Amino acid sequence: MPFPVTTQGSQQTQPPQRHYGITSPISLAAPKETDCLLTQKLIETLKPFGVFEEEEELQRRILILGKLNNLVKEWIREISESKNLPQSVIENVGGKIFTFGSYRLGVHTKGADIDALCVAPRHVDRSDFFTSFYDKLKLQEEVKDLRAVEEAFVPVIKLCFDGIEIDILFARLALQTIPEDLDLRDDSLLKNLDIRCIRSLNGCRVTDEILHLVPNIDNFRLTLRAIKLWAKRHNIYSNILGFLGGVSWAMLVARTCQLYPNAIASTLVHKFFLVFSKWEWPNPVLLKQPEECNLNLPVWDPRVNPSDRYHLMPIITPAYPQQNSTYNVSVSTRMVMVEEFKQGLAITDEILLSKAEWSKLFEAPNFFQKYKHYIVLLASAPTEKQRLEWVGLVESKIRILVGSLEKNEFITLAHVNPQSFPAPKESPDREEFRTMWVIGLVFKKTENSENLSVDLTYDIQSFTDTVYRQAINSKMFELDMKIAAMHVKRKQLHQLLPSHVLQKRKKHSTEGVKLTALNDSSLDLSMDSDNSMSVPSPTSAMKTSPLNSSGSSQGRNSPAPAVTAASVTSIQASEVSVPQANSSESPGGPSSESIPQTATQPAISPPPKPTVSRVVSSTRLVNPSPRPSGNTATKVPNPIVGVKRTSSPNKEESPKKTKTEEDETSEDANCLALSGHDKTETKEQVDLETSAVQSETVPASASLLASQKTSSTDLSDIPALPANPIPVIKNSIKLRLNR
């Protein structure tokens, strides 16, 4: 298929006439010949990764969507006739399939699924969609693997149509007929709709709005393809695990296009890393000024919603109702992504100076050589069908474990690898399906202390409790569904992972990327003495943006000012070496650029977390004590770089365990001694106590008592575990690092 490359002449003769974004562009410079050559090289580099679909396959998708669209129209006519609508209405009743996501954006890859939306008039009910339309799909020869998920947060029908996976949502509009030229961006369409229809419409509305807010769609698409591939190769593409999903990456690329409206893909990729390695999080990324439609729908607004002030990396969807697409981002995942942005900037600097090729940007660093300590999570189920359900649930809650680990006073970073792996069987004679995730840990370096005792038992058990509670209440729990956790050192990973996964990668050049300190301690990510490669690892590169002058008088515990204010400041980016060659952005100019950001969203520095004692019981899961209510205003100290994050005001705080109680309870666990690591490999002595993971049946009398039970941070509306016996995995992970 053709790959459009905007030429120098066309950009100069047809500059964008519109003003895009909430600020003025940083540069209007037109591309040079070297930029066009670099863009062509970028395309050639991307091709082997399968990011471009062949024209034949694209036409096949169009044909399938056409058949699906005809089925929808036919079905709606049948429904209309069954409900005795006038013939004049039936003839023009319409109905339509819309697409959204990567396919609608034009950046889908080979074999990717299609996200679709079925839009119907007001006399067609959601129940019709999940009954008569489902039955109609079942009769189609091309349709395989048909299944309905009616109880999902966004109800969906999933199917495989002639080999293409399709997810179909449903929305009923308050219209008598559905015209062919219907524009879903019209906010008036949301009137009198139920919340499920609004959620279903949101994907299409956001996708269409993004495409209308970029200066050049072809340049946007090619840049987004490159950034998505880079994010996937660097294991930071996963909304569910606290990184960014497809729509978030699309909005970041769209904002870059707005700031450099005449630039082409090679320049835009470089500017993407420049802008977001300098971004003053948690200032929000906005593609347009939020608009109020007076429909009383909840929108992202830190002035109104206290929890919105605690979002760490807000990227706001442009369509009403505006939402933060990155609410899952944690301290650790933001640190990882910011460090990757910095490394991306260093590499693209080299590329623009002809010191490196594009392939270097897409080299995948080896996650399993980054850290000395890892937590391995194992999820197992007796059948493949149960494994799929169980793995989906466990994966959706891993971010809760990461959040709990990073609040531990001894942990600097908890980095989960978005990839899951098949786990070795526990017994070759037993049929069992197991999936494994790996979390890299960096422990805080302590000064004036010889010993560092770390007890992760509570963090693991709290996570396990949350997953089991969700499984039981969703009626998917089976007795043989298990979760296990273990601590392993880097050199022990070969016992769990295949050799090709652990293969060492070529060392990246990261000249100009400096690792910063967190909590006045450097990150201990050095390699074992026998390891020859070194991959720069995430650090606390994040910087807390100061309060602006207008907000300083309000006090830190007052609501955050409006992000919709028209005033925007230009925050001067720190100095960066901009390549002198092959750059269309004034190579002879200053070495720093002004990155426009919304200065009306100040950084909210949360209060330091308290240390609360906790006791590990040998007969039941440990549950946190109720956290103090966050409704009362709390005076927050001045911003501190790297301060430990607390939960949102309306959430509970995880208690900490004192050293005394840790020593007392260590006698209750059956521990397995393993060796560990310290910074100095030749002098380290690490006593690791890891209790064997046991499956216990907790009797009703010893089960979680309601009076002791508090809700999870993610499941505040879920009741306590039932009194009947259930298997509970005991996970005791205790480490004593002797320095």
Swiss-Prot record:
Region of interest: Disordered: 1-22, 523-725
Enumerate composition-biased segments (Polar residues): 535-557, 566-582, 691-715
Cofactor, how bound (note)? Binds 2 magnesium ions. Also active with manganese.
Provide one Gene Ontology biological process annotation.
Answer: cytosolic mRNA polyadenylation
Per its UniProt record, what InterPro entries does this chain match? Answer: NT_sf, NuclTrfase_I-like_C, PolA_pol_cen_dom, PolA_pol_NTPase, PolA_pol_RNA-bd_dom, PolyA_polymerase
Q: Work out whether the entry's keyword set contains Ribonucleoprotein.
A: no
Low complexity: which segments have biased composition?
Answer: 1-17, 523-534, 583-594, 611-622
Motif range (Nuclear localization signal 2):
644-659
Q: What GO molecular function annotations does the UniProt record carry, in alphabetical order?
A: ATP binding; magnesium ion binding; manganese ion binding; poly(A) RNA polymerase activity; RNA binding
Can you tell me which residues bind Mg(2+) 2?
Answer: D113, D115, D167
Q: Could you tell me where the Basic and acidic residues compositional bias lies?
A: 650-660, 676-686
State the reactions this protein catalyses: RNA(n) + ATP = RNA(n)-3'-adenine ribonucleotide + diphosphate
EC no. given is 2.7.7.19
Its family? Belongs to the poly(A) polymerase family.
**Under which name does UniProt file this protein?**
Poly(A) polymerase alpha
Origin species, per record, is Mus musculus
Q: What is the lineage of its organism?
A: Eukaryota, Metazoa, Chordata, Craniata, Vertebrata
